Curated annotation (Swiss-Prot):
A Pfam family it matches: UNC-93
Family designation: Belongs to the unc-93 family.
Organism encoding this protein: Homo sapiens (Human)
Cellular compartments annotated: Cell membrane
Domain of life: Eukaryota
GO cellular component: membrane; plasma membrane
Topology term for the membrane: Multi-pass membrane protein
SUPFAM superfamilies: MFS general substrate transporter
Transmembrane segments annotated in the record for this chain: 8-28, 42-62, 65-85, 86-106, 140-160, 202-222, 257-277, 291-311, 320-340, 344-364, 395-415
Protein name: Protein unc-93 homolog A
Database matches in PANTHER family: PROTEIN UNC-93 HOMOLOG A, UNC-93 RELATED
Residues with glycosylation annotation: 190
Length: 457
């Protein structure tokens, strides 16, 4: 097997194991720990920590530890969060959420940097276009990574499926579910029936073990990215400490980045809505917590399949077509969620919505990462740090207002932000089409590759 592909697969399966645990836990936080909003507060704190770390940690850690060391260290924060759930309280979930958040931005920045460099290096050796290899590697990664939601949620559904069956709720009590849920209602719903603590411990044990395996896999099998860079480009020059620290903010001199900040912001908002509002106000409220995993499996499976599909299709259609597809799909889902009144006998509809949400989310995950990697190829660490910063802010906002706004208000907010996002993205495409060739920065790649980066992606 090609060495580059092997490294991509190691990263992908390491993230698969790690997010099998974290993805399952995130989907259940708002339902398991609904008392006084502990679950959503923990998630909001988590992404607040990620927002802060995005400002300075990723470039520093990647420069000092390399991509592999950064990934390993950051993964340990995720394992700590799983352990913290064994003793869920304000004194355990909040500190471990902060720890996870501080490691999340470096983790994703290191992953994106690793795949981008690996793709460009392999493309140079194989005589292929760098952007195509980067897109392909991101497609492979997200195919494997997004399936983590399938396994994580399948585990939770099988474990919680041992909970005694819940009675069907009266019609009048279902009126507080869905878009009408304002979280102030005192009506009893299926969300009040929590699984036994023994089942919760069983689930957490499985998740913690999965996270530990992820750390061991990366440590044992992933080739350090600096070794790859030395082989293809020679020894890397030393970067001053403060230059690395400020690189995240210096990138805002590029007007394209200023226009693109809404893309990761919306990505965080829509993911936060699905994992918090949809799972709690629609699924748990109407069907019960044991159905959360099954519904999220549909989302994850669709997301995974579309991720690899988009990685292949984008080289023929261009990214703009995929962005329009994602926007239209999400707008349709939001309007339907505003109008729909969920009932237990609408079982298939719960899966349709989660599946369509995955179709659109795959666009944001694959194309956003590839777009940042291509447009800011010479400032990858800082660009991806900025991406995670704004995505984290989206999560913080989504979880932060979760306990204070009605679901229908949150849907209107999503619609508004998505509209602004597409306008800003369209402006970036206009800028790119009018400036097919840009001046070379010191140390930039050859002109042919630069032209491809600016005109094709």
């Amino acid at each position: 097997m090609d060495r580059s592909l092997r490294n991509v697969l190691v990263v992908s399966f390491g993230f698969l194991l790690l997010f099998t645990a974290y993805g399952g836990l995130q989907s259940l936080q708002s339902s398991l720990y609904s008392e006084e909003g502990l679950g959503v507060t923990a998630l909001s704190t988590l992404y607040g920590g990620m927002l802060l770390s995005s400002m300075f940690l990723p470039p520093l850690l990647i420069e000092r530890l390399g991509c592999k060391g950064t990934i390993i260290l950051s993964m340990c924060g995720y394992v700590a969060f799983s352990v913290g759930n064994f003793f869920a309280s304000w004194y355990t979930l909040i500190p471990t959420s902060i720890l996870l958040g501080l490691g999340a931005a470096p983790l994703w920045s290191a992953q994106c940097t690793y795949l981008t460099i690996t793709g460009n290096t392999h493309a140079e050796k194989a005589g292929k276009r760098g952007k195509d290899m980067v897109n392909q590697y991101f497609g492979i990664f997200f195919l494997i990574f997004q399936s983590s939601g399938v396994w994580g949620n399948l585990i939770s559904s099988l474990v919680f499926g041992q909970t005694p069956s819940q009675e069907t709720l009266p019609e009048e009590q279902l009126t507080s579910c869905g878009a009408s849920d304002c979280l102030m209602a005192t009506t009893t719903t299926n969300s009040t029936q929590r699984p036994s603590q023994q089942l919760v411990y069983t689930l957490l044990g499985i998740y913690t073990g999965s996270g530990v395996l992820a750390v061991l896999m990366i440590a044992a099998f992933l080739q350090p990215i600096r070794d790859v860079q030395r082989e293809s480009e020679g020894e890397k020059k030393s970067v001053p400490f403060w230059s690395t620290l400020l690189s995240t903010f210096k990138l805002y001199r590029d007007k394209r980045l200023c226009l693109l900040i809404l893309l990761p912001l919306y990505s965080g908002l829509q993911q936060g809505f699905l994992s918090s509002e949809y799972t709690r106000s629609y699924v748990t409220c109407t069907l019960g917590i044991q159905f959360v995993g099954y519904v999220m499996i549909c989302f994850s499976a669709t997301d995974a399949l579309c991720s690899v599909l988009y990685g292949k299709v984008s080289q023929y259609t261009g990214r703009a077509v995929l962005y329009v597809l994602g926007a239209v799909t999400h707008v349709s889902c939001m309007i339907a969620l505003l109008l729909w009144r969920p009932r237990a006998d609408h079982l298939a509809v719960f899966f349709v919505f989660s599946g369509l949400w995955g179709v659109a989310d795959a666009v944001w995950q694959t194309q956003n990462n590839a777009l940042y990697g291509v447009l800011f190829e010479k400032s990858k660490e800082a660009a991806f740090a900025n991406y995670r910063l704004w995505e984290a802010l989206g999560f913080v906002i989504a979880f932060g207002y979760s306990m204070f706004l009605c679901v229908h208000v949150k849907l209107y907010i999503l619609l508004g932000v998505l509209s602004l996002t597409m306008v800003a993205y369209g402006l970036v495409e206009c800028v790119e089409s009018k400036n097919p060739i840009r001046p070379h920065a010191p140390g930039q790649v050859n002109q042919a590759e630069d032209e491809e980066i600016q005109t094709k992606m």
